[in-house]
Amino acid sequence: MDLTGSAFVIGASGIGKACALAFARYGVRGIVIADLTLEAASAVAAECKSQATHPHFLAEAVAIDVTKEESVYQAIAYAHQVLGRIDYAVNSAGVGVQLANEIAEASVSEFEKMFKVNVTGTFIVTRALSALMKTQDPVPVDEAVPARGVSRGSIVNVGSASGFVATPGMVQYTAAKHAVVGITKNAALDNAKHGIRVNSVCPSWVDTPMIRKAMDDIPELGEMIQKAVPLGRIALAEEVADAVMFLSSPKASYATGCNMILDGGTTLAAHV
């Protein structure tokens, strides 16, 4: 995978952490990891250094609150200052469902919190990254194949298979992830003329700390996932990161506005 530029990853656990480590292993020259908790981001940056393959690899950490515009712009400005440019950006910030209820009993406060982080946060991050990348010099996607054009950057949002199907008792999550798909599509359309690609990965159940906690709280959840997924197992965060690496790389130079479902076949037969 030809990933020789610099990366900016939001999210220091689960999918975000897996993406950061994958970028380091695939040879990026530098990375900035952002998280609400600076200590968590710093720990991932240190781990990236231990796995990096670029001889002059650089890894830094920065705090970010995706719900606050000033925080997002400051974090992105810091990453740009440290790295010189941002070639690959991944937004993995998000919150899961705390109260699962049918629509008649659904929590308005949780709905609003879900949208503040998962939707408004995605919008602010995508907006800020788009503005920054527009100022960057275009670089050839593949010098050996000029027809692939030039790039000012790639953005990958972490969505969900819930952006395509509904799940009983989870209207807040379903609605929020449908919105992420919409933001990704519109951003891709607006940014195409600037040489900026915008895509998303949309997994179903992934083995992350958030899902493991849910499985601890709901003992039958593991068995339910196993039965619901045609491939018969939960996804690894590393498998989602593999898809992000592809979408970030020159191999996906013609992919923009793509919302890649990674669900082991779940949405083929049922809800998530």
UniProtKB/Swiss-Prot annotation:
InterPro entries, per the entry: NAD(P)-bd_dom_sf (IPR036291), Sc_DH/Rdtase_CS (IPR020904), SDR_fam (IPR002347)
Pfam families for this protein: adh_short_C2
Molecular function in Gene Ontology: oxidoreductase activity
Keyword DNA-binding on entry: no
Entry superkingdom: Eukaryota
SUPFAM superfamilies cross-referenced by the UniProt entry: NAD(P)-binding Rossmann-fold domains
Gene3D superfamilies listed in its UniProt record: NAD(P)-binding Rossmann-like Domain
Keywords assigned by UniProt, alphabetized: NADP, Oxidoreductase
Organism: Neurospora crassa (strain ATCC 24698 / 74-OR23-1A / CBS 708.71 / DSM 1257 / FGSC 987)
Group of enzyme by EC: oxidoreductase
Taxonomic lineage from the root: Eukaryota, Fungi, Dikarya, Ascomycota, Pezizomycotina
Keyword Transcription: no
Function, in words: Short-chain dehydrogenase; part of the gene cluster that mediates the biosynthesis of sordarial, a salicylic aldehyde structurally related to the phytotoxin pyriculol. The most interesting aspect of this pathway is formation of an aromatic product from the highly reducing polyketide synthase srdA. SrdA synthesizes a reduced polyketide chain from one molecule of acetyl-CoA and five molecules of malonyl-CoA. The polyketide chain is then reductively released as an aldehyde.
Induction cue: Expression is up-regulated during sexual development. Expression is also up-regulated during confrontation with the arthropod fungivore Drosophila melanogaster.
Residue numbers binding NADP(+): I15, D65, R127, Y173, K177, V206, T208
Name by which UniProt lists this protein: Short-chain dehydrogenase srdC
Family classification: Belongs to the short-chain dehydrogenases/reductases (SDR) family.
